[in-house]
Amino acid sequence: MAIKFNNVSYLDKLKDINYTFKEGEITYLIGSSGSGKTLLSYLMLGLVLPTKGNLSVLGNIIDSETKDFTYIRRQVGYVFQEPMEEFFTTSVKEEIEFGLKNNKFKLDKLDKQVASALKMVGLPLSYLEQNPFTLSGGEREKLAIAIALSLNPKVIILDEPTIYLDDKSIYELVELIKKIKEKYNKTIIIITNDINFVMKLEGNILLLKKGKVNLDITSDKLLDNIDKLKRSGMEVPSIINFINRCDKIKNKKFTKTLDIDKLVEEIKNDKQI
């Protein structure tokens, strides 16, 4: 296990959370606005402390009395919803270097580590001197991920990573997340309400409703739980509603990972529909 919640509550915002984020796997943390998703992630970093229960983060216990979060914050990388809010220097190189220097990374290995972080996310070295504020939305997201990966954390948390991205950038993000998981063996937690995105990558799904665990499934079971998503206040794409209502399509044998674009083509090409 990477992170385990043991009967965790926080004031009246989160109630009796019991859940394990599995090591080396993708987990989607979903729920309507105000359900407690981001607050749950803040507990993993020690930004807020549980008022009841405890959680284990990579073997380190966080409870209401915990004071030292040095190891945890180095091993859990966090990419915020709006990457530009993280940037405050005038070059891509300086952005990545800042976190490394702050964590006392060896200066003689700094350039190599910065280059390695850019390579991991597919950004060219020619971007090193570029102002981060001039990057496209997809490039800013990649840079924010590179900053998080530069310290080689075991866990990466992405907060609403698709919210400002176009379709091309979302496709590139999907491929990057696959690479991070498979090649670098990271545990990835994705906070999102983008159901289309959830369907593109196989993973675990934790649905919160009013601060409580409402659903704990794997992504191949998502179509069987559409009504529960809607009752929790989630917005479900029209194509998913269509699939859910059509017995012919619902009973069709799709792969565990359902790519919406591929599905649309299958629907169009099915002469019996």
What are these regions (language model features)?
Residues 53-64, 71-72:
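Conserved ABC transporter NBD signature motif
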Residues 145:
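Hydrophobic anchor residue at the start of the ABC signature
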Residues 156-159:
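Catalytic Walker B motif of ABC-type/P-loop ATPase nucleotide-binding domains
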